Amino acid sequence: MNLSFADTLYFKKENILEIILGLHRSYKSLQREIQICCELNNLTFNELIVILEIKKGIKKKIDIANKLFLKKQNLNLILKDLQLKNILKLDNKSILITQSGEELIQKTTDRINEKIIKIFKKTDPKNMSGFINIIESL
């Protein structure tokens, strides 16, 4: 039996979120796939990143803005758009993901997960050292 590097990887859901948040800047093919998934689900990339951070447990606007290096007024616009799309529900101090938002994130991360695995199956393991270090640190 001949196993490729991608066959030996095990992607947990929380690791996929970290990969999306951490690697989108360095891997062009991954960046392209994420962009396609965003467009299919009528999201911008910043909206996806904000939703993923909220899903990871960050509930305060200031924490999200600091973590993603967004200006607060930009974050407010993103949150307002997500609320209009019925993805988020904004209370006084908390931000909640709606049921339709949960389904959208599930669908998006599943699709990105499939694409990530396909990309890695095509990639020579010799070129994966940086990625391996990131995966090991998760």
PLM feature spans:
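Short, locally clustered residues in the helix-turn-helix/winged-helix DNA-binding domain
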Residues: 52-56, 109, 136
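Charged, amphipathic alpha-helical coiled-coil/dimerization segments
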Residues: 80-133
